Regions:
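Conserved nucleotide- and phosphate/pyrophosphate-binding catalytic cores
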Residues: 1-165
């Protein structure tokens, strides 16, 4: 039911293949609880389809999180650990990295997770990582009109934007 809105927005091809349809069902399931009407889904899907690392760093609503006492240490440690292993990010791998970041930085809760969420979505709030990460990884492999950046691409873009700011 949401497919026509994504096609009109240029986010899905006119005739998606089966893999794209299966992936798209996961996208809708992830985002539907956060909208009131189906036509709001493509805009909400911006966190999947549109990456603006510089904009995320400059966003006023992210300032408090990024200005937190441990935010720079958490981000630097996360980026270093995630880049060290070039394998595809999975929820399990992410959890292991975050446990290592937690131990190394002695940070937990929102001070640990919100800065990393900004790397992946451009916002300090959003979907659960265990649901989002597979969508990003799978989407990056599909023939979509707009490329979905996987987690490594998002980390790289954030690192570049962060060094430029």
């Amino acid at each position: 039911m949401a497919e026509p809105y994504f096609i009109k927005a240029g986010l899905l091809p006119e005739n998606p293949d089966e893999a794209t349809r299966t992936w798209f069902a996961k996208v809708v399931a992830l985002l539907a609880p956060s909208v009131n009407k189906l036509d709001e889904l493509p805009e909400r899907a911006g966190l999947i389809f549109k990456v603006d690392a510089a904009g995320a760093l400059a966003a006023a609503d992210n300032a408090e999180v990024l200005g937190g006492a441990k935010a720079n240490e958490v981000l630097a440690t996360f980026i270093e650990m995630a880049e060290a292993d070039k394998s595809t990010m999975t929820p399990e791998r992410f959890k292991a990295i975050m446990n290592d970041v937690k131990a190394k930085t002695e940070t937990k809760g929102k001070d640990l997770f919100h800065p990393v969420r900004i790397v992946f979505t451009g916002s300090h709030s959003g979907p659960e990582f265990d649901k989002l990460i597979p969508i990003l990884e799978e989407g990056s492999q599909l023939p979509l009109p707009v490329h979905v950046m996987n987690t490594q691409e998002r980390i790289a873009a954030f690192k570049v934007a962060r060094s430029a700011s």
